[in-house]
Amino acid sequence: KLKQAYFVDIVPEVAEKCSAELQEKLGFAVESVAMDDRKSAVRKSDIVFTVTTGSQELVYFDWLKPGTFVARLGSYQEVHLDVITRADKVILDRWKYVSPRIPEVIQLIEE
């Protein structure tokens, strides 16, 4: 059962608004986190979702606890290469759609 969530956005006001809305809907604590403080939120998390259209790396492998589940739902560029290449498992839905967008997966296969 989820007990805590963190919401990060490049615009602090957006993070605060979305956190408040989600907390009301979900019924558990949702804390807004400044972009510069995202490392601390990732380190405390068992599940990390990234949803962005940006190309900035937002999550790094050494921030993750062992066993953390990471779902990339955005631009496919929001995690550092090591998050993919050092993962225990990489799960894809449709190869023909994903393979051209995620060169790290091709790199894993070639290794």
Indicate residue ranges for each PLM-predicted region.
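A structural micro-motif
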Residues: 3, 28-30, 68, 88
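NAD(P)-binding Rossmann-fold cofactor-contacting core
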Residues: 2-26
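Generic secondary-structure signature for well-ordered alpha-helical cores
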Residues: 20-27, 47, 75, 95-96, ...
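Rossmann-fold NAD(P)-binding glycine/threonine-rich loop
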Residues: 63-111
